[in-house]
Amino acid sequence: MIYGRQDIFGNINTMNLNIDYETFEKQLGLYRDGMLIQDAFPMLNRDEREFIMTGLTPEIWDSMMHEEEEL
């Protein structure tokens, strides 16, 4: 499990990732050094990679898109 800070709302969200801690730390280092997220974490799906980048879960994205559609 990793934690991500959701900057937009200031909430802390969690997501379970099917990756061991050592691999996660290694790949995160590659991402932070400039590698594209999809290249650094090819074993993760789009939602999991988005969470690493933003701290936003799929449910939060869906609610944000729904609110935007209502405007």
Give the location of each predicted region.
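N-terminal acidic leader/helix
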Residues: M1-L30
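Generic alpha-helical secondary structure signal
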Residues: D7, E25-L28, M35, G55, ...
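Acidic, low-complexity, intrinsically disordered interaction modules
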Residues: Y21-E50
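Short, compact, well-ordered microdomains
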Residues: P42-L71
